[in-house]
């Protein structure tokens, strides 16, 4: 498979799965191994094309992001207060990721670790959906700093490739009293600062792996990731208001089982 075609495939996978509770990184690792696109350069490529998915969320929620940087507060979740909550959500995983980045790439970027994370995350989704916690937060404007920090702590689980940042933050929000649709919406918006910082940091650290000839491939992955993320996020916004997360948990278990039983030893 040519690098350009690999970029298209991986861009679709990244955009379609980044904001679903199924783990985009886990899917990229599995698909990368299947198409022979592996190694340190491939791992960094997977992280860098996240920028396309990030931009998709910014476009979909552009008004919310504008309110965050606008000097005049428009809602409770805007201006300095909104930025402060996003900072609190990004802080725990950001600090741990900064310290453990090399170890995570060295020991957890493999199909077996991904399959285990998919399984653990699926079990947790089932448990969270059985929760008896009463919803206390229904909109972004009802978010509190404590809720934002709590979701950020759950986000640390996403440092395990295959667990899913989206799953971790949505489950965390639900356990802390957020309505499922609010937890999903905040998961999208709250992802942007951490993902943007992680992508830029990874590119800075791995820039020596890429040459000018790779810019075209990176561009393809970026554009395809952007388009597929736009479609996926819009669809998920509708779905999460109508169904639970259980179908995604069953999918995770099925994919994990396929890896455990059929992946070459």
UniProtKB/Swiss-Prot annotation:
<feature type="transmembrane region" description="Helical">
    <location>
        <begin position="243"/>
        <end position="263"/>
    </location>
</feature>
<dbReference type="GO" id="GO:0071555">
    <property type="term" value="P:cell wall organization"/>
</dbReference>
<keyword id="KW-1133">Transmembrane helix</keyword>
<dbReference type="GO" id="GO:0008360">
    <property type="term" value="P:regulation of cell shape"/>
</dbReference>
<feature type="transmembrane region" description="Helical">
    <location>
        <begin position="42"/>
        <end position="62"/>
    </location>
</feature>
<feature type="transmembrane region" description="Helical">
    <location>
        <begin position="80"/>
        <end position="100"/>
    </location>
</feature>
<feature type="transmembrane region" description="Helical">
    <location>
        <begin position="19"/>
        <end position="39"/>
    </location>
</feature>
<dbReference type="InterPro" id="IPR003824">
    <property type="entry name" value="UppP"/>
</dbReference>
<dbReference type="GO" id="GO:0005886">
    <property type="term" value="C:plasma membrane"/>
</dbReference>
<keyword id="KW-0573">Peptidoglycan synthesis</keyword>
<keyword id="KW-0046">Antibiotic resistance</keyword>
<feature type="transmembrane region" description="Helical">
    <location>
        <begin position="108"/>
        <end position="128"/>
    </location>
</feature>
<feature type="transmembrane region" description="Helical">
    <location>
        <begin position="220"/>
        <end position="240"/>
    </location>
</feature>
<keyword id="KW-1003">Cell membrane</keyword>
<keyword id="KW-0997">Cell inner membrane</keyword>
<comment type="function">
    <text>Catalyzes the dephosphorylation of undecaprenyl diphosphate (UPP). Confers resistance to bacitracin.</text>
</comment>
<keyword id="KW-0133">Cell shape</keyword>
<keyword id="KW-0378">Hydrolase</keyword>
<comment type="similarity">
    <text>Belongs to the UppP family.</text>
</comment>
<feature type="transmembrane region" description="Helical">
    <location>
        <begin position="143"/>
        <end position="163"/>
    </location>
</feature>
<dbReference type="GO" id="GO:0046677">
    <property type="term" value="P:response to antibiotic"/>
</dbReference>
<dbReference type="Pfam" id="PF02673">
    <property type="entry name" value="BacA"/>
</dbReference>
<dbReference type="GO" id="GO:0050380">
    <property type="term" value="F:undecaprenyl-diphosphatase activity"/>
</dbReference>
<protein>
    <recommendedName>
        <fullName>Undecaprenyl-diphosphatase</fullName>
        <ecNumber>3.6.1.27</ecNumber>
    </recommendedName>
</protein>
<keyword id="KW-0472">Membrane</keyword>
<keyword id="KW-0812">Transmembrane</keyword>
<keyword id="KW-0961">Cell wall biogenesis/degradation</keyword>
<dbReference type="GO" id="GO:0009252">
    <property type="term" value="P:peptidoglycan biosynthetic process"/>
</dbReference>
<feature type="transmembrane region" description="Helical">
    <location>
        <begin position="181"/>
        <end position="201"/>
    </location>
</feature>
